[in-house]
Amino acid sequence: MANTTGRIPLWLIGTVTGILVIGLLGIFFYGAYSGLGSSL
């Protein structure tokens, strides 16, 4: 855990990126399956 001053830790970047990707995919699939044609 050295050299983290002034930088964002890699685990934090990975966690935030993973959450964002999963969230976007979840919203996309939710809109596709729940709305089908109404969301387009």
Swiss-Prot record:
Disulfide bonds: none
Gene Ontology CC: one annotated term: chloroplast thylakoid membrane
Gene3D superfamilies, A to Z: 6.10.250.2070
Membrane topology: Single-pass membrane protein
Cell location: Plastid, Chloroplast thylakoid membrane
Transmembrane segment boundaries: 8-28
Biological process annotations from GO: photosynthesis
InterPro entries in the record: PSII_PsbJ, PSII_PsbJ_sf
Keywords: Chloroplast, Membrane, Photosynthesis, Photosystem II, Plastid, Reaction center, Thylakoid, Transmembrane, Transmembrane helix
Pfam families named in the record: PsbJ (PF01788)
Family to which this protein belongs: Belongs to the PsbJ family.
NCBIfam families (alphabetical): PRK02565.1 (NF002722)
Xref: HAMAP family: PSII_PsbJ
Subunit structure: PSII is composed of 1 copy each of membrane proteins PsbA, PsbB, PsbC, PsbD, PsbE, PsbF, PsbH, PsbI, PsbJ, PsbK, PsbL, PsbM, PsbT, PsbX, PsbY, PsbZ, Psb30/Ycf12, at least 3 peripheral proteins of the oxygen-evolving complex and a large number of cofactors. It forms dimeric complexes.
Summary of the function given for this chain in its UniProt record: One of the components of the core complex of photosystem II (PSII). PSII is a light-driven water:plastoquinone oxidoreductase that uses light energy to abstract electrons from H(2)O, generating O(2) and a proton gradient subsequently used for ATP formation. It consists of a core antenna complex that captures photons, and an electron transfer chain that converts photonic excitation into a charge separation.
Name of this protein: Photosystem II reaction center protein J
